[in-house]
Design a protein with these regions (language model features):
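Aromatic-rich, solvent-exposed beta-strand/loop patch
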Residues: 6
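Active-site glycine/GP-rich loop and adjacent strand/helix microenvironment
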Residues: 9-195
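Carboxylate/His-rich catalytic cores and anion/metal-binding grooves
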Residues: 1-3
Length: 195
């Protein structure tokens, strides 16, 4: 898809995209400069990138208008990241679980519990990988991708499916994501991040 078409689609959908792969201090300065003109109500993106942007804003004594929510994805959200994001953007932070192969596997509710998006995926524990005393590899079946379906795809993430209900009112199954795939981010001396 041509770049102009991507920009047009984003404009029509009122979406502004920051590039997480180019997120050094100079890029974040530009993000902070354009942020007020966006009228943003939510933010969605990599946990580490949003957390570093929040830290950037905070260390420069900047401020932004409160958001309705921040949705983190693609990486493990650590407690200290959740805290700085919530503090700077003055809103709840919701962690979402997905992968590049199958998006929208699960999302956190208002009670902080992870619900499987059962209208998009079937999520199973790999029973061949041992007993339930430890997290087991997850098998994901996409109900959304008709062109290239993933059926019982083992994505190397580990978790536990819970046999209980949540008092938030969402009846979708609960899960705990215990161990996700490992990836490292390296911060270069000039502030650029290598993923």
């Amino acid at each position: 898809m041509p770049r102009w078409e991507i920009r047009l689609r984003q404009e029509l959908r009122r979406v502004y995209q920051f590039d997480p792969f180019h997120s050094g201090a100079s890029e974040m300065a530009q993000w902070l400069k354009v942020w007020p003109s966006l009228g943003a109500t939510i933010a969605h993106g990599y946990a580490s990138t949003i957390a570093r942007f929040a830290e950037y804003i905070e260390t420069r004594k900047g401020s932004v208008a409160p958001l309705r929510g921040v949705f983190t994805t693609a990486e493990k959200l650590y407690p200290q990241q959740r805290e700085v994001i919530a503090r700077v953007f003055n809103c709840r932070v919701y962690d979402c679980y997905g992968s590049s192969e199958v998006q929208n596997i699960a999302a956190e509710c208002s009670r902080g519990r992870m619900h499987v998006n059962a209208d998009f995926v079937v999520l199973e524990e790999d029973r061949a990988a041992g007993d339930r005393s430890t997290p087991r590899p997850l098998l994901v079946t996409s109900l959304w991708n008709y062109a290239m379906p993933f059926i019982r795809y083992r994505n190397e993430d580990c978790g536990v499916l819970l046999d209980e209900n949540c008092d938030c009112g969402n009846n979708f199954p609960l899960m705990e994501l215990n161990i996700a795939r490992v990836s490292d981010n390296f911060v270069l001396p000039d502030g650029r991040v290598v993923r």
